[in-house]
């Protein structure tokens, strides 16, 4: 939702409170793909013979091992987090820093806030550096990754969180408002993911978590640009997950709903009541709750078999 991103506009909150989310009426069946692309619906076992006993035993042995025995655990992983100076990005940076990660805190304009985040991580006993840059620009992304590599020698996890809103109704939306949101929220994710994959492929290991939004799944009035970008992040991440799987690179998506922020705190009682009425759990989410999910996907051995998935953390809005 709009409240899950930096500096959202009130129009989206009003629209949701007034009209709610429209339920998708039908799901269209996709036409058959070109024959050059595998048709997964036709996959079948070529052999009528049962699996060999040795294969079954090998699978059983693997499942009996704990996740920590199957998956190599990285000590003090190096993490790059975009848009990490405030809000959800800040909560993620602090959670991963507290977990022992070495964190690069990216920011666009909030240098002072980013330094405070880095300071807090160091107070936890971790390591952190800051980097000011626009992730919609390839030169800035390359410089950011190089900064982390020069400092720590590797990059284990990338969290793409940076984003903006330029909310207005579709019929009033200027192309500049469309372009700005697509550039940062979608192209920025592409550039950072591409740069990260190049590094991770060499060592055959890595995790990428892209922060989307429940709006990317169900849309929202006044946010055509934002919905397009966040929906694109989900589809892009699924493709990246397929391409990175052979090199043990996991790519997943987190889709927050209404997350408590300075903006939600300023809403009147009537407006808040209407908004909460659209959330089955009846409350806003917390940035720390989103950070907890990201921490699991980024660090837990139990998440090693999860890739290409979009996780909603929205109080039930997208049910």
Swiss-Prot record:
Location in the cell: Plastid, Chloroplast; Plastid
GO-annotated molecular function: 3-oxoacyl-[acyl-carrier-protein] reductase (NADPH) activity; copper ion binding; NAD binding
Any one GO cellular component localisation term in the record: nucleus
Enzyme class (EC, first level): oxidoreductase
Active site: 226
N-acetylalanine PTM sites in chain numbering: 58
Any matching Pfam family: adh_short
Residues annotated as binding NADP(+): 81-105
Gene3D superfamilies (alphabetical): NAD(P)-binding Rossmann-like Domain
Keyword list, A-Z: Acetylation, Chloroplast, Fatty acid biosynthesis, Fatty acid metabolism, Lipid biosynthesis, Lipid metabolism, NADP, Oxidoreductase, Plastid, Transit peptide
EC number(s) stated in the UniProt entry for this protein: 1.1.1.100
Matches recorded under CDD domains: BKR_SDR_c (cd05333)
Gene Ontology BP terms: fatty acid biosynthetic process
PROSITE patterns xrefs: ADH_SHORT
InterPro entries named among the record's database cross-references: 3oxo_ACP_reduc (IPR011284), NAD(P)-bd_dom_sf (IPR036291), Sc_DH/Rdtase_CS (IPR020904), SDR (IPR050259), SDR_fam (IPR002347)
Top-level taxon: Eukaryota
Reaction catalysed by this enzyme: a (3R)-hydroxyacyl-[ACP] + NADP(+) = a 3-oxoacyl-[ACP] + NADPH + H(+)
Annotated substrate binding sites: 213
Transit peptide start and end: 1-57
Pathway: Lipid metabolism; fatty acid biosynthesis
Quaternary structure and partners: Homotetramer.
Family: Belongs to the short-chain dehydrogenases/reductases (SDR) family.
Protein name: 3-oxoacyl-[acyl-carrier-protein] reductase, chloroplastic
